[in-house]
Design a protein with these regions (language model features):
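An extracytoplasmic/periplasmic, membrane-proximal ligand-sensing/linker region
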Residues: 261-319
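Short, hydrophobic beta-strand segments that form beta-sheet elements in well-ordered domains
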Residues: 149-151, 190, 209-212
């Protein structure tokens, strides 16, 4: 026996080697592996966004990780969200890439949207600013109704008409793509979104009227924030947010707190790494992501107010 290794030391060393060889507990495996459910197609925008998000999380863990992308359904995200809402819990962490449009489908009352996003936990998301803009200064009493181009009643762009109704400004809908109709002189006002919506509005010859975002952000801008004084106003902002949230990575509501904490720490790199892509929008995590995500899931009375407006104003009811 070597004088440098006692029997007790050899026993401890053997136990340590055995521990390394044994499978780790399920909880430990869940900390560095998971499945990200992604709306299709495989080469679509959501899949590319998911690949960037997965790479950031892997680097943020600072240890080998196994994040798998599972593509399901079409780009509106409803099929993927429905599946995510009904999946059973497992050892691996579960994530969903959720576009803003998916939440808007639910806001309008479409029966095919059978998910409830209110309790989901956003880790990271990409967000665009939004504002209501028009031709010239905001008219308080236009001589003729302002024309608002909307692709369809259930499109989030219809929120421009709803906003003007709440402001007491006479307006009427016209069918069309908002920016194209505005450029052709066939529309007088529209919602403008993007990383810098004010600059984009001015580039197309529009004057920013109201910032369609949170009051806190409005205080930092020369553009007044859209007043929020009723559930109907919150419903309008929820519709606009369907355009603003490009994508979010969310976890189920009942995810264990320690698992959420691990992945939230990993997501802290997201804003810094996304600065290389300023044209894609604002990268949000933490309370910023939670606040933005909450806009898309307003209280029930706000949701009902927007659906009622769609029915009474545009004669549209989801089926």
């Amino acid at each position: 026996m070597s004088p440098l290794v006692s029997p007790l030391g050899r026993r401890n060393a053997g136990l340590a080697m055995l521990a390394l060889a044994l499978p780790r507990p399920a909880g430990a495996q869940a900390q560095d592996s998971g499945t990200i459910l992604v709306p299709g197609p495989e080469d679509g925008g959501c899949a590319r966004w998911a690949a960037r998000a997965a790479a950031v999380l892997t680097r943020g863990l600072q240890r080998p990780a196994n994040l798998r992308l599972s593509v399901l359904g079409g780009p509106d995200g409803v099929t993927a969200a429905n599946r995510f809402a009904t999946q059973e819990g497992g050892n691996d962490a579960r994530f969903l890439v959720l576009p803003g449009w998916t939440c808007h489908v639910r806001l309008t009352g479409a029966t095919r949207a059978r998910f409830e996003p209110r309790g989901w936990l956003p880790l990271m998301l990409t967000w665009h600013g939004a504002l209501l803009a028009g031709r010239g200064a905001l008219p308080t009493r236009p001589l003729v109704p302002l024309r608002i181009a909307i692709p369809s009643p259930d499109a989030p762009e219809a929120a421009a008409l709803a906003a003007l109704d709440l402001l007491g400004i006479t307006a009427q809908p016209v069918i069309g793509v908002p920016e194209a109709a505005f450029a052709a002189g066939e529309a007088d006002a529209l919602i403008v979104t993007g990383p810098d919506p004010a600059a984009r509005a001015r580039a197309m010859g529009a004057v920013p009227w109201y910032l369609l975002s949170t009051p806190a952000e409005g205080q930092l801008s020369e553009i007044p924030p859209f007043p929020v004084t009723s559930p109907a106003h919150r419903g309008v902002l929820a519709a606009v947010a369907g355009l603003q949230m490009r994508a979010a990575l969310v976890m189920p509501a009942l995810t264990p707190a320690d698992t959420v904490a691990i992945w939230r720490r990993a997501a802290m790199r997201w804003p810094d790494e996304e600065r290389a892509h300023p044209d894609l929008g604002l990268a949000l995590i933490g309370t910023g992501a939670a606040g933005a995500f909450a806009i898309l899931s307003p209280p029930p009375e706000a949701t009902l107010a927007y659906r009622s407006w769609l029915d009474q104003r545009l004669g549209w009811r989801a089926g």
